[in-house]
């Protein structure tokens, strides 16, 4: 009888614990799904309120600009692959500031973020898309984050893709990224040395657009890191 009572109590507490966990997870809003330039955008309902009508219009115009520049330079097949990678747009999410890609749910749960952000490009603060400093420094930030998503979800073996990893290791060993020019005129260590993920995303910016670290553009990438240039030509297609 005592065992049955203990078991019943344990079951009750287990159910309560599960209910509390579900309630905690449900504190996050349900996004409203929109389409923009062929991409699925999961939008914070607050951004769509009438009081934010002007902000929403400006933000969507800016985001469309980012996506159009990807559409207009890449082959159609690559565009379609990228359009399968969703974007999550917050009005203003205080805990995070930088635009980022969320590859796994463990970090999201551990830091009490919405686990549904997993496998999304995340724009935590809509106004960042309108920031002049952001445009001056990082005009291809959305491409950068989508490159992370593509690396993770599309390339063979994801972030452990052998070709990218080998190119990164070779570039790191060569030391040619240790001191490079930053967009501001300073000489710094290239952000791409952080890991193979940042190396791929940073070099993709240079190959398809403009990066904030040297090599800034495609011709410079070909001169500075021909191996990665050739790999990106194979991955993204030749840009003429």
Feature roles, as predicted:
Residues 8-15:
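Bacterial N-terminal signal peptides
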């Amino acid at each position: 009888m005592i065992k049955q009572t203990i078991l019943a109590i344990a079951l009750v507490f287990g159910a309560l614990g599960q209910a509390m966990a579900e309630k905690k997870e449900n504190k996050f809003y349900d996004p409203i799904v929109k389409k923009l330039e062929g991409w699925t955008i999961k939008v914070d309902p607050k951004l769509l309120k009438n009081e934010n009508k002007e902000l929403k219009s400006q933000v969507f115009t800016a985001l469309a600009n980012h996506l159009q520049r990807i559409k207009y330079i890449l082959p159609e097949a690559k565009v379609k692959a990228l359009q399968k990678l969703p974007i999550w747009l917050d009005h203003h999410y205080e805990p995070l500031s930088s635009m980022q890609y969320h590859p796994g749910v463990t970090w999201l749960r551990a830091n009490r973020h919405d686990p549904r952000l997993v496998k999304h490009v995340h724009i935590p603060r809509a106004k960042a898309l309108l920031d002049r400093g952001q445009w001056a420094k990082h005009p291809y930030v959305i491409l950068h984050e989508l490159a992370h998503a593509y690396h993770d979800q599309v390339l063979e073996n994801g972030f452990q893709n052998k070709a990218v990893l080998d190119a990164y290791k070779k570039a790191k060993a060569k030391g040619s990224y240790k001191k490079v020019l930053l967009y501001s005129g300073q000489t710094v260590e290239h952000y791409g040395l952080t890991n193979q993920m940042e190396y791929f995303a940073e070099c993709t910016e240079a190959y398809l657009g403009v990066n904030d670290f040297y090599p800034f553009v495609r011709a410079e990438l070909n001169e500075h890191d021909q191996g990665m240039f050739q790999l990106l030509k194979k991955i993204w297609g030749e840009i003429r």
